[in-house]
Amino acid sequence: MRELPDIEDQRGLVSTSQLRTAGWSRSAISRFVRSRGWSPLPGVVYGHRTTLDDDQRVIAGWLWAGPASALTGGWGLVRHGLVLAARPVLRRFVVADPCHSRVVDDVEVLHVHHAPTFRNLSGVPVVPLDRALIDYARGFEATADSVRAVTIRALQTGLTSPARLEAALGETRPNGTRGIRSGLIDFERGAWSVPEAQLLRILSRRRPRLKLQMNPRLVDTSGRLIGVPDCYLPDHRVAIQVHSWTHHAGFHGARDQWADTVDADARYIPHGIAVLPVSPTVLRDHPERFLRLLDGVLLAQQGRAKVDIRIEVAVEPTPLAPHAS
């Protein structure tokens, strides 16, 4: 029996249209599926009886959607390199005229009036990250809070920029984009994560007189980097570190990332900087506990000798509108 053609980047998957172009008859395709492979989606053939991994499922979805389609939504974000908190459910694609919207299983094809721009990422055409993020939000693939977190992550990692994201938002209706807009505001105020945005909001509301800077580079007089605290209070020489096990656990190569995170806090002490660690859970559920600890640290720092340091690339947060406490 004939072997399936090995098409680059398709990982053993072939569309029946490609097989017909290669000279396969309908009966030959049917015999192959019955005897050796299987069809994960209509018009798509896989040459083994094993299940597909996530990457193969995306490729299969694209083969079903057609060569004029482009991946968008959650799986589009993953293809661009974003790590999502939850595995996307839908494989979502966009197509332009004369194609139509259609759905099968968890694969959805959405019709748009203009052909989408795309990049080929690992064999699959993918819309720009900003468009994928908007479709992810407006398609209700995640909650507004999750979209907010993904937006901040995309900006913080440099996968997009505020200008590009604002331009993309300006080309679409505002409904369904609240999480994106919130994340954009958070990032422009200096936050690199949702917990940091919560910290900024707490301090701006409850301790509005404190001068603070988000994610500044602190260097000593010789220009050597001391660290990049999540939040720095320069008048009191206090570094606030939001320590999340979710984001800092695990290994990078042979290095324990959590141990490195904790050890890094010790670098501030010789420079007269007090470190106040706080967890995202405390910021979210017990802000008063955090504020009591902060007040104690501020009091302890009064009158302590100051060591010369320099602040680089500090972001001054925009004052938040007042809220009722």
Specify the residue positions occupied by each region the protein language model found.
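Surface segments flanking catalytic/ligand-binding clefts of nucleic-acid enzymes
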Residues: L155, L159-S325
